[in-house]
Structure formats: C-alpha cells, structure tokens
Amino acid sequence: PLLPFLLAQFAPDGRTLGLLAGSYALAQFLVTPLIGALSDRYGRRPVISICVAGSVLGLGLFAVTVSLPWPSQSLLPLLMLFAARIIDGISGGTAATASAVLADITPPDKRARAFGLIGVAFGLGFILGPFVGGQLARVAVSLPVWVATGFAALNLLVVLNLLPETHPQDSRKSLPRKRDLNPFARLSQVLMNPSVGRL
C-alpha cells in the first residue's frame, strides 16, 4: 500500500508502478522450482541462508534508493528499485524450502497442525503488516522499508546461528531435468489435474 508514496519523488506512471509491484511475484514464481531443487540437492540450510541474505540485500537496496534525493528525470533510481524488487522476489522463493524444513523436523501425526500454525502466522502478517507499516510511515515514509531490512538481517543471524541442516546427505537428490524446473510446465500439470480442473 505504501509503494506509490515511497516512489512519489520519481513521479512514476501507473504502468511503472504495476511492473514494479509485479516484478517481485514474477521473480518468485520463476525461481521457486529451482530453489526447491537446489535445497533437495545441496541441503536446506545453505539455500535458505543465501536467500535470506538476498532478501537483506534487496530490501536494503530499496530502502537506500527511496531515501536518497535524486535528480529529476533520472532513470537510475527506477532501475535500482526494479533490481531490488527482483532480488527480493528471487529470495522469496525460499518459502517452499522453509516448508520443507518444517516437514523434515515434524512427525507425520503433527505435520498438519504445524503447517496450520504457519498459515496462521502468514495470515497475521498480511493483516498486521499494512497497519504497522502505516504507523511507521507517519514518522518517515521510508521507515517501514528500513525496519523490514532490519528484521531480514535479524532473520539472517538466526538462520546462520540456529538453523540446523534438516536434510541429511543420504536423502539428497540429483538436480532434475530442465523441463521439471520450468514453472509454466509445473503450472500446466496442476491445471490439468482433474480436481483442480473442476474448480
């Protein structure tokens, strides 16, 4: 919700705002199968560590860009914002790997409850996030991005110091074929499922 206000100094048109908002989701959609495959091959911990570090980088770049004064008509800040959103979107592809960690450490009879709690946490984030961001923006419009960067950095410290490797070496798989990493091929398989098709 704060994106138009964060970008006000750049006077972007509606198309630029839409592309900037959608670039995160597109990057996440494209890389999620690859990140999942890499975690199956090399382990959960290194993949999550790299992705969380990427999130710190993407959010930090975004925060710096919207906080600095720029010459009018300059394209550089918009390019930096797109780079920041894409980096953060790629890093966001680790959500499936985080779910895999939960599956690795949870007994089958408690797995549904654990995933339910994760769903509740996501829901609370979507509800409380805009409210908290709005309150922080009253102090400074870029403050929510800086706070998010700080939380991402804290998350990275937690991952590096506390997250164990939950995917043992003898359970790891080789990388799949390129076709299996194609998100559009995966999406078509889902859509062709009779249960989904009826929806």
State where each predicted segment sits.
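Juxtamembrane intracellular "pre-TM" segments in multi-pass secondary transporters
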Residues: P164-L199
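C-terminal ends and interior cores of transmembrane alpha-helices
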Residues: A53-S74
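Cytoplasmic helix-loop-helix junction between adjacent transmembrane helices
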Residues: F82-F122
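Helix-loop-helix hairpin linking two adjacent transmembrane segments in secondary transporters
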Residues: I118-N161
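Residue-level signature of mid-helix packing/kink "hotspots" within the transmembrane helices
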Residues: A25-P33, G93, F126-I127
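Helix-loop boundary and gating motifs at the non-cytosolic
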Residues: P1-A25, V196-L199
